Amino acid sequence: LSLENTSALSAELPAALPYVLTLGAALCFSSASLIFAQFSRRLSVLWVNTVKALVAALLLVPTIAILYATGLAPAVAPDLTSLGLLALSGALGLGIGDLFLLDAYTRLGVSRTLILYGFQPIGLGLVAAIFLGQAFPLGKLVAVIFLIACLIIFSLERYKESGHWEIKGLLNALIGVSLDSTGVFISRLAFDHSPELHPLEGHFIRCLGALSCYVVISCYYKSRGEPHRRIRLLEYWRSLEPTARRWILLGCFGGTYLSLCLYLTAVRIGHLGSITAVGITGPMFAALLEALIHKKRPSRYLAAAFVAFMIGFAVLLLN
């Protein structure tokens, strides 16, 4: 696959832009994850995932229409290869992967689950170097090491607090992270195959892929005589009070629509391994928000993680 068009686009943009976009995406996603975890415990993981994919898809329709009307994006239909790749990416990463992740949220907590994203940059960076021809210089590797150090610090803190890891929750988190990484890589393949494709168009196709996956899962439960495990979209929605409805909609807007719009834009124009490294700062944001919500004073572990993050981010921008 040729990267000439993508490289040319990246050369015209500020070098720090992909990292700023990824940082914003991480903040949106980690904040929304706290909301998703609460409603997953209260209702069901399948329901929350369906709602967030549906809300994102509905928001993307007018957004893409505005892009077409203003000429910011060409109204070019993606070819079947890119369409299939993005749908597969949505089904695996945004669909099945998020089912495992949200289940892990309910078992391990948001911060602990997001810690496992620390193992994502090395794998994705190497895959990108092998299959996409992207360089992975020593400077970027040093930055990734500092960024992963943030998560090791958080991991140590959580282990000292609990003394153990829940095996099922840990396995679900690992599976979710792996599927999410696969989805990110497939999305990049689709964008490289169709450079004219706008990230929001890709995000919309991914949402449709995820929704299709959820419908299949729901039908599977029905065929097995387990109707209580189906999506039950309207039933659960009607059971929520107005305040709860506003919170879940806010989480869907920030965590699925805005965060992935920012992240897919960064994936399209930036270095895949480095972008993923910045994206793993989500646990830091989640831990900060949890501290504010529960009115707990930030620990020395949090301060140390921030120092490691700032050093790694500085190295990243200099390379």
Model-flagged regions — what are they?
Residues 26-35, 42-96, 146-149, 202-230, ...:
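Transmembrane alpha-helices of multi-pass small-molecule transport proteins
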Residues 60, 126-129, 138-158, 301-319:
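Hydrophobic transmembrane alpha-helices of multi-pass small-molecule transport proteins
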Residues 1-47, 58, 164-201, 212:
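Glycine-/small-residue-enriched transmembrane alpha-helix faces in small-molecule transporters
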Residues 39, 48, 104, 116, ...:
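Hydrophobic/aromatic residues within transmembrane alpha-helices
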Residues 42-47, 99-116, 194-201, 261-281:
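Structural motif at transmembrane-helix junctions in multi-pass transporters
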Residues 17-25, 64, 72-96, 100, ...:
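Loop-to-transmembrane-helix transition segments
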Residues 30, 61, 90-95, 121-126, ...:
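Hydrophobic/small/kink-forming positions within alpha-helical transmembrane segments
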Residues 55-59, 116-131, 145, 208-213, ...:
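Alpha-helical transmembrane segments of compact multi-pass small-molecule transporters, enriched
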